[in-house]
Amino acid sequence: MYLTQDLELFHEYTVTQLLFKDVKNATELRKMAVNGEIKGALINPSMVVDAFQILVATNKAVHLHKIGKMKTRSLYSEIIFNLSPTNNISEAFKRFGISDSDTAVHIVLVHNKEETLNIDDIISKVDGQQIDVGQVSEMTDTAKIKKLYKITPQEDKCGTLLDAVVCRMAIKDVA
């Protein structure tokens, strides 16, 4: 149901992803995240192509956190920011964070391997149905993603949508 992976470059960290649909308490979840009651990134799954996209954003966020170069105030807000193709923080939150009207949420947790993670505590806070993280692509709004990341038809023919999105995320700081 959830996906847990170690970060290759930061062996001491593990990333856990959870996906929920039919969520009825998005407003409360967002408030809990803002207040620090949920230590995780709450992401709108319609803007996610694949769990790998989240892993890339998380890896970059952990890297920037470790070297003290984050552009946002927390590791979890940095994950949301890293999903965006632009450097506008508020725009990233609007597009990739959850809103009060959302009925699905993708939760990303980053934890030290030595820490015990109480996933059941997080799950109990969500009034919705947990589904397998692999199903995130079924929630993807492909048209919205192509427009936001400015993916051309030519690019679409020679590679996957995930490739194009991850490339845009990777070069955001370079371009």
Curated annotation (Swiss-Prot):
Keywords, ordered alphabetically: Cytoplasm, Nucleus, tRNA processing
Domain of life of the native organism: Eukaryota
Compartments where found: Cytoplasm, Cytosol; Nucleus
Free-text disruption phenotype from the record: Embryos display primary microcephaly, leading to early lethality. Marked apoptosis is observed in the brain (telencephalon). Fishes do not show a renal phenotype, possibly as a result of early lethality.
One CC-aspect GO term: cytoplasm
Matching Pfam families: CGI-121
InterPro entries in alphabetical order: CGI121/TPRKB, CGI121/TPRKB_sf
Chief location bin: cytoplasm
GO biological process annotation, one example: tRNA threonylcarbamoyladenosine modification
SUPFAM superfamilies: PF0523-like
Subunit: Component of the EKC/KEOPS complex.
Annotated PANTHER family: CGI-121 FAMILY MEMBER (PTHR15840), EKC_KEOPS COMPLEX SUBUNIT TPRKB (PTHR15840:SF10)
Free-text function comment from the UniProt entry: Component of the EKC/KEOPS complex that is required for the formation of a threonylcarbamoyl group on adenosine at position 37 (t(6)A37) in tRNAs that read codons beginning with adenine. The complex is probably involved in the transfer of the threonylcarbamoyl moiety of threonylcarbamoyl-AMP (TC-AMP) to the N6 group of A37. Tprkb acts as an allosteric effector that regulates the t(6)A activity of the complex.
Entry's family note: Belongs to the CGI121/TPRKB family.
The protein's name in its UniProt record: EKC/KEOPS complex subunit TPRKB
Species of the source: Danio rerio (Zebrafish)
The gene coding this protein: tprkb
